Amino acid sequence: MKPEFWQDRWNKDQIGWHQKSANPHLVKYWPTLNISQGSTVIVPLCGKSLDMRWLEGLGYNVLGVELSEKACKQYFDQMELEPKVSKNASGKFTIYEAGNTQIWCGDLFDLDADDVKYVSALYDRASVIALPPDMRERYAAHLGALIPDPQGLIITLDYDQSKMNGPPHAVSDAEVQRLFGTNWKLTLLEEVDKKDMFKEEGIEPVERVYKLN
């Protein structure tokens, strides 16, 4: 899967994964994690997610990472904010910043340890399921190396992949444990049947919520 795939989806406004309010699992479980206010939360492949506004509203610093410049700009447009624009130290990312939220526009795999040195929490709602198997391996290894022991949430989707091509891709519980369990401690918090999500395709996906601790 090449970057152009996602750029094209954003350019054509084919962004069915975008939610119009904060994710209910985030709202339900994040306050139970007891993550200190003022902590920095990384949101990989963040798009223009309103989850970032919700996290900032609770007193967190948010570091979103997003490939699409259009998505980065639209996030602040919907907030009616004019972001400050700068570059990171390596020059590989354009940083859009307003309030306590930064969105780094660039390739997630170009992040280095210095870029995320203040990050202590992670929120992944639609990141790992956006990626095909080979990229999921890279994603988990990359974040595991950069962020040794984060708190946070990972939300995944699982279904019969033979019935539909992703994204969103099916990621089983066993794969989540294999990908992330090497570097991080995971606890399954909830499984939810999402029977209406892909009803026309005859698929009955399961959504899983994991705690990082």
Curated annotation (Swiss-Prot):
Per the record, the GO terms for biological process are: methylation; response to metal ion
Q: Where in the cell is it found?
A: Cytoplasm
- What is any Pfam family matched here? TPMT
Named from the GO MF annotations, one term is: thiopurine S-methyltransferase activity
Amino acids binding S-adenosyl-L-methionine: 10, 45, 66, 125
Q: Report the superkingdom from the record.
A: Eukaryota
The keyword Methyltransferase belongs to this UniProt entry's keyword annotation? yes
The record lists the catalysed reaction(s) as:
S-adenosyl-L-methionine + a thiopurine = S-adenosyl-L-homocysteine + a thiopurine S-methylether
InterPro entries in alphabetical order: SAM-dependent_MTases_sf, Thiopur_S-MeTfrase_Se/Te_detox, Thiopurine_S-MeTrfase, TPMT
Disulfide bond among keywords: no
Signal peptide residues are none
- Which top EC class is named for this enzyme in its record? transferase
Q: Which SUPFAM superfamilies match?
A: S-adenosyl-L-methionine-dependent methyltransferases (SSF53335)
Q: What EC number is given for this enzyme?
A: 2.1.1.67
What does UniProt give as GO cellular component? Answer: cytoplasm
Q: Which UniProt keywords apply?
A: Cytoplasm, Methyltransferase, S-adenosyl-L-methionine, Transferase
Per the record, the similarity remark reads:
Belongs to the class I-like SAM-binding methyltransferase superfamily. TPMT family.
NCBIfam families from the UniProt entry: PRK13255.1 (NF009732), TMPT_Se_Te (TIGR03840)
Report what the protein is called.
Probable thiopurine S-methyltransferase
Look up and give the organism this protein is from: Yarrowia lipolytica (strain CLIB 122 / E 150)
